[in-house]
Structure formats: structure tokens, C-alpha cells
UniProtKB/Swiss-Prot annotation:
Keywords, comma-separated and alphabetical: Endoplasmic reticulum, Meiosis, Membrane, Transmembrane, Transmembrane helix
Function: Has a role in meiosis.
TM segment ranges: 41-61, 88-108, 159-179, 186-206
Gene Ontology process terms (BP): heterochromatin organization; maintenance of rDNA; meiotic cell cycle; regulation of exit from mitosis
Membrane topology: Multi-pass membrane protein
Domain of life according to the entry: Eukaryota
Protein name: Meiotically up-regulated gene 154 protein
Region feature Disordered, mapped onto this chain: 291-316
An example Gene Ontology CC term for this record: endoplasmic reticulum
Main location group: endoplasmic reticulum
A Pfam cross-reference name: DUF2418
Length: 316
């Protein structure tokens, strides 16, 4: 008898269609390399949206003819001269563009954040940023003097950030009300490009600072860390199986120790409620534990020839 496969019913497919489509859109959104796309298409796309929105508003306003009701009242009344479906469609499309502008601004400024957690430190530690907040934790052996802090860092998408600069809500509202004024339109575009220029310069400043910090850490590792940790050592084996008078000493080729790491877990950090149990620090393994250092069988080491020396008692 063949394998029975339970197929999804048509009702379940119809019910799950919206959430499945939403998950598919989210996966496609995450699969896009936005760093490459933003450098090439963000500014042309934003300018195209501005141009289309401006043309729609000009067409909608040009279909209104202001006339005066009489000589007594100077109020003006707009009479629609074109009630076609095309004008209604353009009005709906311009409202959608305005809604997208507000939605993009709110999403790129409020919901694009990354969370980082610090090691347990003193509760009285003062922070220089308001984005650092203490994290509630459950710990059986909590001494009450240490606290884990969480840092929320703004990490905007570059494509959405450029789009927010060139098609911000203020920019869209100005084009909505003053689309027929050439002077106001040019000043609006000038202001948007000025904002984009400052944002790009500030992003470049952050990249330069990150590069400078990496170079400082690299220089520190090269000058202080590596010379003290990666010290060249040699293995020495002493054979005393025939007595102390006939002991022999064998020297091996000097080499650097193999770096291995151990997971170090903090008791207060393991009991956090919002994250699973993950290692928060790595501790360098002592070079005396040679039986765990992963020495290959063909390496120049005495433990390949003398297995009883694997306890590390004869290492010098």
C-alpha cells in the first residue's frame, strides 16, 4: 500500500491564503540585498514617485475652475469640470502615495531597531544614552547588585531612508496643496536634496568611525594580544621507563598553541525571560589541556608516541 499523504482542504487554503501571502512577501523582502539596491535604485525611484505624484496633483487641480457666486460674497467655489473615472482613479492613487509616505516615515524611524544586551554590571552605572534600559530577569542566586541592560539601536534600511528623505510626509503635503506653484515646488525639491545630502554625509561619518575603531582594535591585537597569547612553545617528552639513570629527553619542533575556546555562561544572564539560553562570553582554554586541543595524529607532538603523558604533567 502506498504512502498516504493528507492533502490540505480547499477551505483551509482559502482561510490561510492571506497569512501565506504575507509570509511570502516578508520572505521576498528579507531576501533582497538592500545595500546594493539602495545605492543604485533608491534615488531614481524616489524621483520617479515625486514626478508621478506631482503630475497627478497638477492634473487634478487643473480640472477645477474657480468662479465667484455673486458680487456680494467673494468666496470662491470649485466646480468640477471633469467627472470621469480617470480623475477619480488619480485622486485615489495620490491618496495612496500620501499614505505610503507617512507609512514609510513611521516604519523607518520607529520600527527598524536592533537590540543588544550587555553583560551583568552594577545597577548604579550611569548611561550616556536614553536608549539603554534595564531588563527584567529571574534569577535564583541574584545578589541584587548587578543588572543586565538592553540597548536599542536605530538601524534603518538605506533604501527606505533615502525614500523618506526625498518623499517625506512634509514634502508630499507641500506638493498636495501647492503643486501648481513652480517656486514652492522647486524649493521643496531643494530642501529634500539638502536633507538627503546631510543624511548621506552622516552615514559616511558613521562608516569612517567604524573603520577607525576596527583599525584601533586590530592594532591593539597585533601589538599586545597576539604577542602574549600566541607564544611559540615546544613540546618536550621525558622517557623514564627503564629507570631514572637511563632517562631520555626528546625535543620537538616549536609551534604556536592551538586556540580553543570554552563557553562561559552567566547565571544572571541565563535566566532572562525574553531570550533563549545563549553563550554570552568565550573564555580561552588553558594550553595545559592538551588532550582537548585537537592535535592531529601526524603532528610533531609527544602525545602521539606517549599516550600516558596526555594528562599534561610532563609539559614544560
Amino acid at each position: 500500500m502506498g504512502k498516504l499523504i493528507r492533502r490540505t482542504s480547499l477551505t483551509s487554503k482559502i482561510i490561510n491564503l492571506p497569512i501565506d501571502y504575507f509570509i511570502y512577501v516578508c520572505e521576498q523582502f528579507d531576501s533582497v540585498e538592500w545595500d546594493k539596491v539602495s545605492d543604485r535604485y533608491s534615488i531614481p525611484f524616489s524621483l520617479a514617485v515625486n514626478f508621478i505624484f506631482l503630475l497627478m496633483r497638477i492634473y487634478i487641480k487643473s480640472t477645477h475652475v474657480p468662479v465667484q457666486r455673486n458680487q456680494l460674497f467673494v468666496d470662491k467655489q470649485s466646480i468640477n469640470t471633469s467627472r470621469s473615472w480617470f480623475r477619480a482613479f488619480l485622486s485615489f492613487l495620490s491618496i495612496c502615495f500620501l499614505f505610503i509616505s507617512f507609512l514609510n516615515f513611521i516604519f523607518s524611524t520607529r520600527f527598524q531597531n536592533k537590540l543588544y544586551r550587555t553583560l551583568p554590571q552594577d545597577k548604579r552605572t550611569t548611561t550616556s544614552t536614553p536608549n539603554v534600559k534595564p531588563v527584567f530577569q529571574h534569577s535564583n542566586n541574584d545578589d541584587g547588585d548587578e543588572q543586565v541592560f538592553e540597548l536599542k539601536v536605530w538601524s534603518p534600511n538605506q533604501f527606505l531612508l533615502n525614500f523618506a528623505c526625498l518623499f517625506s510626509p512634509a514634502h508630499a503635503l507641500i506638493l498636495w496643496f501647492y503643486s501648481t506653484s513652480l517656486r514652492v515646488t522647486l524649493l521643496t525639491f531643494l530642501l529634500s536634496f539638502t536633507t538627503l545630502h546631510f543624511v548621506n554625509k552622516f552615514s559616511l561619518l558613521l562608516k569612517d568611525q567604524q573603520y577607525l575603531h576596527r583599525q584601533v582594535f586590530f592594532e591593539y591585537d597585533k601589538k599586545f594580544v597576539e604577542p602574549r597569547l600566541s607564544v611559540v612553545k615546544r613540546d618536550v617528552a621525558i622517557n623514564t621507563t627503564r629507570g631514572p639513570t637511563t632517562a631520555s629527553i626528546e625535543y620537538f619542533t616549536p609551534r604556536k598553541p592551538i586556540d580553543t575556546f570554552l563557553e562561559h555562561r552567566s547565571s544572571s544572564h541565563d535566566h532572562l525571560t525574553s531570550t533563549p539560553r545563549t553563550p554570552i562570553a568565550l573564555q580561552r582554554r588553558s594550553v595545559h589541556h592538551l588532550h582537548d586541543s585537537g592535535i592531529s595524529r601526524d603532528s610533531s607532538s609527544p602525545f602521539k608516541r606517549f599516550p600516558h603523558l596526555s594528562d599534561g604533567s610532563s609539559r614544560f
